[in-house]
Amino acid sequence: MGSLGMYSESGLTKKGSSRGYDVPEGVDIRGRYDEEFAKILNKEALLFIADLQRTFRNHIKYSMECRREAKRRYNEGGLPGFDPATKYIRDSEWTCAPVPPAVADRRVEITGPVERKMIINALNSGAKVFMADFEDALSPNWENLMRGQINLKDAVDGTISFHDRVRNRVYKLNDRTAKLFVRPRGWHLPEAHIFIDGEPATGCLVDFGLYFFHNHANFRRSQGQGYGPFFYLPKMEHSREAKIWNSVFERAEKMAGIERGSIRATVLIETLPAVFQMNEILYELRDHSVGLNCGRWDYIFSYVKTFQAHPDRLLPDRVLVGMTQHFMRSYSDLLIRTCHRRGVHAMGGMAAQIPIRDDPKANEVALELVRKDKLREVKAGHDGTWAAHPGLIPACMEVFTNNMGNAPNQIRSMRRDDAANLTEEDLLQQPRGVRTMEGLRLNTRVGIQYLAAWLTGAGSVPLYNLAEDAATAEISRVQNWQWLKYGVELDGDGLGVRVNKELFGRVVEEEMERIEREVGKERFKKGMYKEACKMFTRQCTAPNLDDFLTLDAYNYIVIHHPRELSKL
């Protein structure tokens, strides 16, 4: 992968390299040794990961080069669009394999990181599905990744528990739990704690490989009714990337001796190029697919990134870029039509609100916003939706149940053939709205706070009554970068000033003072707010836009992470 050069052998501590771990030839573990971790990182599991890495690394490298080539085209004025070469796939009649009975009903799904208490609460939440996240809701330090694998194994085994010493309460699984999906990292992210043949492993192959190796048999027996495990696949930009996943699944099934098509996955459509590839993505995964999901926050981030060299496509304040914008509604409608035509789920987007326990009026206002958003989704034809907090499950469930009745989904009842005429212009239409100083301030304040939390090991962060993950920081970063690069006028609040480095510097200074007031001096001093501020500011003011904030930040947690947390 093209992004791996920064994680060279000289850049990582050699202390304890593979010490204590029984590793196969060509595999080197750079994370600290732990007896519990060693049970996950046994020789057989590492052989499985090494086989996946060696089999698919050249395909992955080629796909990442294709991403860079597409970026060059867009930066030279090109636009993403439907591929004429695959028109036959879009136009012909075919369907994906039938949806497994275990996941026919997905009307509300909850998401969260692979932390022990979170897993128990999410599985007990009353949602139909829990998506356990190794990606945007997790800071991928060594402890988080390995403990996440241990937690998931215990969850699949049914033995997971958690003793909250502060509340003196023990958490255990209920008799009835949500179905478990797991989201590995995207293709672009390395796993720099594990080297295979002298280069960092591919992060998603480590996440997928360890989880599948240790859990496929128990999962199929206890959760999947003969199917599974189930996955969510993030950040893809082209069907060639889905084809790699399909090949990974087939190889894993063959090595495990289970039936082809057992593994099932939902793909997040969260990049602008992927919206033109939805039929092709489903086609590549047709034996392993259980639908597509509207990853709307990352989709907005991708819109800015794709059009970084297009000054005629500037975004308004990000709070104005909702699902009522024409390009967002078109994306949602086409996703529903595509999925239902191919016989799989069309999943709606995230409700990120957190219950406001100390303000009932504000809480009801927030819940009403959630209900309206979910009503729009179910009436449009979505088969289910996402929530970030257990407190939102009843409201979301009520809306979907009231409109779907006893049907587990709307795959056959909401064809959305009216969306067949949506054009490239519909999907690329510039969003409307104003740009304000408050928009610039909010981006800066939220971006710095999220990054500070990420650097200290937290990937899902409550900020201003919303559960934020990496997507929020990415939108904030790229929008600030876009406004700075093109010197946009803040036309929405009567100020009429243009964004430049001097103005941005003042905003950063003032927002850091506000953050210190809000979190308190002691927490501010102990946290990594200053480091996060430097990194976020550098990213916003760089002459060229980095593809992912987390790639830059990952370099920091692998090499410089506090010793008591990472033990590198």
UniProtKB/Swiss-Prot annotation:
GO CC list: glyoxysome
InterPro entries named among the record's database cross-references: Malate_synth_C_sf (IPR044856), Malate_synth_sf (IPR011076), Malate_synthA (IPR006252), Malate_synthase_CS (IPR019830), Malate_synthase_TIM (IPR001465), MS_C (IPR048355), MS_N (IPR048356), MS_N_TIM-barrel_dom (IPR046363)
Substrates-to-products reaction catalysed: glyoxylate + acetyl-CoA + H2O = (S)-malate + CoA + H(+)
GO molecular function list: malate synthase activity
Pfam family, one: MS_TIM-barrel
Annotated keywords: Glyoxylate bypass, Glyoxysome, Peroxisome, Transferase, Tricarboxylic acid cycle
Region (Disordered) residue spans: 1-20
The EC number(s) this enzyme carries: 2.3.3.9
GO biological process: glyoxylate cycle; tricarboxylic acid cycle
Subcellular locations according to the entry: Glyoxysome
Pathway(s) it belongs to: Carbohydrate metabolism; glyoxylate cycle; (S)-malate from isocitrate: step 2/2
SUPFAM superfamilies (UniProt xref): Malate synthase G
Uppermost EC category: transferase
Span(s) of short sequence motif Microbody targeting signal: 566-568
Transmembrane segments: none
Active site: 183 (proton acceptor), 469 (proton donor)
Family (UniProt): Belongs to the malate synthase family.
NCBIfam families: malate_syn_A (TIGR01344)
Protein name (Swiss-Prot/TrEMBL): Malate synthase, glyoxysomal
Annotated source species: Cucumis sativus (Cucumber)
Lineage, top ranks: Eukaryota, Viridiplantae, Streptophyta, Embryophyta, Tracheophyta
